Amino acid sequence: MRVLGKTLLPYHVNAWSLAVAEEVYRQKDLYKEQLETIIEQRDLMREQLEQMGLKIWPSATNFLTCCPQGELTARLAAACEQQYGSQGEKTQQMLAGMYLYRKLLEKKILVRDYTSHPVLQGCLRITVGLPLENAEIISRLQRLCGEEAI
């Protein structure tokens, strides 16, 4: 537990959480199949999101951080202003991310919104879930990044 404590120095993690993490690590073989599924799903989602025109940041976790790029950004930004009106002094990148976030939220799909973050403008963080959940998110994003954003 001392080794874990040293690596987490800048972040506060209580002793109980560290003890649970240590026990999970000791029994990592119990979670191997689940971890393999998450990794497979993450890689599949990365591929599908890139095909839609989204930039994906490298990830070794159970989530992907992504944002529209290129021509897709302009289309989504225009769709945002058309649907929601003028958004003030927001960049196209922010508008594109905001559009995706709001449209997903309308369908009760929750993602982490980083559209106003100074370094991750227009980005969303998508958690890798169960295969059916992932398929639903991908399907919805394909519609949003495709014909709906024209």
What residue ranges belong to the model's regions?
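Conserved Class I S-adenosyl-L-methionine
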Residues: A60, S116-H117
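A common structural junction motif
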Residues: K107-V111, L144-A149
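Short secondary-structure capping/turn micro-motifs that flank functional sites
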Residues: V20, T65-C66, L120-Q121
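PLP-dependent aminotransferase class I/II
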Residues: M1-E50, L54-W57
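Hydrophobic "lid"/C-terminal helical patch
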Residues: L141
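Conserved PLP-binding catalytic core of the aspartate aminotransferase-like
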Residues: I38-D43, Q48-K107, L124, V128-L132
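Short, amphipathic alpha-helical "lid/cap" segments that border enzyme active or binding sites
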Residues: M1, E22, P131-I138
